């Protein structure tokens, strides 16, 4: 995914395309395509770079559970985050960038250990919270040019992914307790 982000930004910058117009446009039927495309599009190289490092680091943390897991988390976060942004963000705006996915990854890593009752995953979540906690909180504060809606719903998508992808052990324990 990161390679695609960089190739698209290079094309946007050098060829002069207007790929950024394919972001999420709230409550516009044409804007629904942005649910799938917006994480790959960035305003400039600075925007892309600020998303690349946490995307790769947290993505690798999720990928420790396998390729299917990281792809599943990514799909859930993109869907929940994109739909939430499309429904709630102000009209006549365009939302682009991978930060919603980054917030989803962080929320997933924070919640996964609790859901699965796994010590290693709990430790990983605590590390994410310690390193990125203030960034996560500040990203939810409404500011000009920042899609706090994308951050919020990306985070919600991460929580949904943690519950939806809970390990069988956790699910079987829950069933036994019921």
Where are these regions (language model features)?
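A detector for small-residue-rich transmembrane helices and their helix-helix packing motifs
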Residues: 1-178
């Amino acid at each position: 995914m990161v390679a695609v982000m960089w190739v698209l930004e290079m094309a946007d910058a050098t060829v002069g395309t207007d790929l950024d117009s394919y972001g999420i446009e709230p409550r516009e039927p044409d804007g629904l395509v942005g649910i799938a495309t917006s994480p790959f599009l960035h305003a400039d190289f600075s925007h892309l770079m600020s998303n690349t490092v946490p995307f790769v680091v947290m993505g690798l943390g999720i990928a420790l559970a396998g390729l299917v897991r990281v792809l599943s988390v990514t799909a859930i976060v993109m869907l929940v985050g994109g739909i939430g942004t499309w429904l709630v963000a102000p009209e006549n705006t365009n939302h682009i960038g991978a930060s919603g996915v980054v917030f989803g990854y962080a929320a997933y890593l924070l919640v996964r250990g609790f859901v699965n009752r796994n010590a290693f995953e709990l430790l990983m979540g605590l590390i994410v919270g310690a390193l990125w906690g203030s960034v996560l909180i500040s990203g939810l504060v409404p500011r000009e040019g920042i899609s706090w809606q994308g951050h919020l719903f990306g985070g919600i998508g991460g929580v949904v992914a943690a519950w939806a992808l809970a390990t069988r052990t956790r699910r079987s324990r829950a069933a036994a307790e019921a």
